[in-house]
């Protein structure tokens, strides 16, 4: 059986500075920050019944489409019958401590808000439910306060339907 990786993406209710301070207080350092513009294209007529992962796999993502070569890719996709479905801009802040194999990502996503994303390769061999619980427990050890029954926000499904959509796994 193929292992499936869980990534949690939890919507946050306080401001960015609050969580930056929490992470710093708990020994993490900001190691990266950027602004990213992604445009997604698909040939799908509808995403009804699709999971976050299925939507992402059915799309072609062009990252930072301002570059000349990406403008040509976009023209070709449109000629091949693809349609633009999502146009997202996010600010990304990555945090890590020396002993972490992965990064905690704080993202401000246009039309969604502030979200924390996290996965951990140490948990990949566990069941989906166990991975999720371990990830939330670990996030809580860094100053967050999530309940293990709380669902994460699905970015693409939320953008698709124009309302917040939640599930147990935000791995796209």
Region locations from a protein language model:
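Hydrophobic, well-ordered secondary-structure segments
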Residues: 42, 115-116, 132-136
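General "foldedness" signal
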Residues: 22-24, 109, 118-120, 132, ...
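Structural motif
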Residues: 4, 68-69, 112-116, 127-129
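Conserved, surface-exposed functional patches that form binding/active-site neighborhoods
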Residues: 84-125
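Mixed-charge, glycine-accented linear interaction segment located at domain edges/termini
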Residues: 123-155
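Intrinsic disorder/low-complexity signature
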Residues: 34-35, 61, 116, 126, ...
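N-terminal strand-loop-strand beta-hairpin
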Residues: 1-100, 145-172
């Amino acid at each position: 059986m193929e292992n499936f990786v869980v990534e949690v993406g939890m919507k946050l209710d306080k401001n960015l500075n609050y969580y930056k301070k929490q992470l710093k207080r708990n020994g993490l350092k900001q190691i990266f920050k950027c602004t990213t513009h992604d445009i997604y294209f698909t040939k799908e007529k509808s995403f009804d019944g699709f999971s976050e992962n299925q939507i992402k796999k059915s799309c072609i993502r062009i990252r930072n489409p301002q570059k000349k070569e990406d403008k040509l890719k976009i023209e070709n996709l449109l000629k091949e019958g693809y349609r633009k479905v999502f146009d997202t801009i996010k600010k990304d802040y990555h945090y890590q401590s020396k002993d972490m194999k992965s990064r905690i990502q704080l993202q401000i996503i246009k039309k969604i808000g502030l979200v924390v994303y996290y996965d951990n390769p140490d948990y990949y061999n566990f069941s989906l439910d166990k991975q999720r619980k371990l990830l939330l427990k670990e996030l809580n050890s860094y100053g967050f306060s999530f309940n293990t029954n709380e669902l994460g926000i699905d970015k693409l499904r939320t953008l698709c339907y124009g309302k917040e959509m939640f599930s147990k796994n935000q791995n796209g």
